[in-house]
């Protein structure tokens, strides 16, 4: 599965468009991460617990997007993006979205 942020893929032509696909995950923060974030906001520095939460959430959302695209018969996703939303300082939603397409190498 090729997943790109651009609207085309060099060396390939888009032979079929299967439509918008997305992968979504909503995760709650660990209370320890919330406490650490409170202290770090005063002292400064990376919020490692939140960084890990976002990293894992993006990977899960991307995997779900790829699975949906594959289920529709696509072998690529173009115009790929992430969108992140925080919920009441207790959790985070990560949505990966793009357009599922069928591509063929240009001869």
Swiss-Prot record:
Pfam families: YbjQ_1. It comes from the Bacteria. Belongs to the UPF0145 family. This is UPF0145 protein MAB_3451c.
